[in-house]
């Protein structure tokens, strides 16, 4: 496995590799758990590397991308502690509960949509290529961190508006 930090120019041109952590996953135990360090720790450490670089690159906008396998709240808590000008774009798979009991995604889409995006989703195993139309919302919210504090985050929701019959919405 490899977790790289890759810089890109605003024109989308890759500029090299800033940092990379490579490892081999350990086999799962009989109970199905994997021994050793949690892989989500690598996402936090990647953000820490960017925080170190932020001091050396004050004119550069740094954006950290993390997939849904990252421990998102742990990452946001640590980034908040570091207080560096690194933005993050985190793909979430969990509809988090907010203070007051409502859910993150429904709270975000209660506001007016910012607009729409239309694109062609490429074919994948068992799925044909198709056009997708999504509405996009954004809202800055205070997310409970599970430890009695809150983390400010700009939350973006993109919802497919008219999926074809039998298609799973994107």
Predicted features by range, described:
Residues 1-3:
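Short glycine-rich loop/turn motifs
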Residues 5-170:
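Single, function-defining residue in the core of a domain
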């Amino acid at each position: 496995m490899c977790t790289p930090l890759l810089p890109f120019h605003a024109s989308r041109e890759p500029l090299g590799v800033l940092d990379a952590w490579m490892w081999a996953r350990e086999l799962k135990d009989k109970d199905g758990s994997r021994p050793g360090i949690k892989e989500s720790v690598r996402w936090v450490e990647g953000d820490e590397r960017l925080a170190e670089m932020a001091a050396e690159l004050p004119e550069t906008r740094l954006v950290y991308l993390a997939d849904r396998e990252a421990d998102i709240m742990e990452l946001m808590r640590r980034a908040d502690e570091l207080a560096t000008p690194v933005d993050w774009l985190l793909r979430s798979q969990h509809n988090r509960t907010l203070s007051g009991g409502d859910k993150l995604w429904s709270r975000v889409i209660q506001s007016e949509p910012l607009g729409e995006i239309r694109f062609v989703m490429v074919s994948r195993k068992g799925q044909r290529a198709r056009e997708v139309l999504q509405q996009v919302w954004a809202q800055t919210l205070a997310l409970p961190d599970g430890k009695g504090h809150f983390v400010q985050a700009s939350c973006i929701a993109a919802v497919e508006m008219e999926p074809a019959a039998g298609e799973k919405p994107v």
